[in-house]
Amino acid sequence: MKWITREKIKVDRVACPWLIKKFIDPDAEFVFLPRSTDWTKISDGIVFDVPDCELGHHGEDVSFNSIMKKYNLTDPALMLLGEIVRAADSHPAGAGLRWVASGFGALGLSDHEILEREFIVYDALYAECRRQTGS
């Protein structure tokens, strides 16, 4: 399936593709479009983490949380990771995650290269969240 979001990815737009590939759609293809895209006109894929979409920010939830809810992902370790993604500025591990995301952006890589390189960070975070939650 094709999954579509905004270009210039950071925390949530790296975490979401990681979540999608690992737990929802291992064959997912990601497309990154400009912020100015009219998201309501896209019909050839699943739109996420853009304004006014089902798999976007709602209340205190970030797109990662919305995707977890939509696909009934209830693993305690994923729930903890969702808290870290949501609170990238306030959770003890969140500030570091924001710095990592900003650092990858500063390397001048394409969004696809950032996904390829940064997925290992989310693999490690998920492993630690599993350890922390005993799941």
Q: Could you describe each region identified by the protein language model?
A:
Residues 1-4, 11, 45, 99-110:
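Generic alpha-helix detector with strongest preference for long hydrophobic helices that associate
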Residues 2-6, 12-78:
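Conserved, aromatic- and glycine-enriched, well-ordered alpha/beta core segments
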Residues 70-135:
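A charged, amphipathic interaction segment
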